[in-house]
Design a protein with these regions (language model features):
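Asp-based, Mg2+/Mn2+-dependent phosphohydrolase catalytic module
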Residues: 2, 6-224, 229-241
């Protein structure tokens, strides 16, 4: 599984950073540790003497965490963020993005630039493409947010697939401007498999002639318009950002 922490670990390695302050649950820093990067948390020795502050999923974040992060940045650490999305969909409905709120507080105090490692970062899309051994234009990005997944796909020339089981409904997708409009609107995640299955038959032709992808997408968009008629709303859980 590839997560924002996977991209963060790769980024920190490329930057030559050996030690990071992690604002997040214990699992947030695991990918960093697996990559040989030492992680520390608020209250531990040397928490403000690090090369990077990495902000991830941290529901229990307190003012001491924010203060420690700010001190580390004032000491020269760079700011790395897993997600800058203000809201996302869960079983309970719309939920705030903790890392977005935490990062906003840190940046308000420090005015530090940030490096985003999750969606819609082109860095994340590039990492996935490299891991899979394919160009970014061969990827499909699936999601429920026009300013996250669709924007990410557009930045890398990938196919953007929208679902209506999260924060954006079918009618809202149709009203999006061209820059945030998906290539296809799917009622639920299970339809992704059939979409990819249909597209897979054309894979050799697309691989041989990359420039024909736009024509292929237009054809798929027309076919998907019929399959994506509004359906009764279903409550579903999407993978967290």
């Amino acid at each position: 599984m590839i997560t924002p922490s996977s991209i963060a670990a790769d980024h920190l390695q490329r930057r030559g950073i050996k030690r990071a302050l992690v604002l997040g649950t214990p699992g947030v820093g695991q990918a960093l540790r697996d990559a040989g990067i030492e992680t520390v948390h608020t209250g531990e020795p040397g928490a403000t003497e690090v090369g990077s502050v990495y902000v991830g999923w941290h529901p229990e974040c307190g003012m001491k965490d924010i203060e420690t992060a700010c001190q580390a940045i004032w000491n020269g650490a760079e700011l790395c963020v897993a997600s800058d999305v203000p809201f996302f969909a869960t079983r309970q409905g719309r939920t705030i993005g903790y890392s977005h709120a935490i990062t906003a507080a840190i940046r308000r105090l420090t005015h530090a630039p940030m490096t985003l490692t999750g969606k819609p970062s082109i860095r994340a899309l590039r990492f996935v493409a490299k891991r899979l051994g394919v160009p970014m234009r061969a990827l499909a990005v699936v999601g429920d947010d026009p300013v996250v997944e669709v924007l990410m796909a557009r930045r890398g020339g990938a196919t953007a697939l929208a679902v209506t089981t999260g924060t954006t409904q079918h009618e809202e997708w149709q009203r999006q401007p061209r820059s945030r409009r998906p290539d296809a609107i799917l009622t639920e995640l299970r339809e992704v498999l059939s979409f990819l299955g249909d597209a897979g038959a054309d894979a050799p032709r697309i691989a041989a002639r990359p420039r024909s992808r736009r024509t292929h997408v237009r054809a798929r968009r027309a076919a998907a318009a019929t399959a994506s008629r509004p359906a009764p709303r279903r409550r579903a859980v999407r993978p967290s950002r």
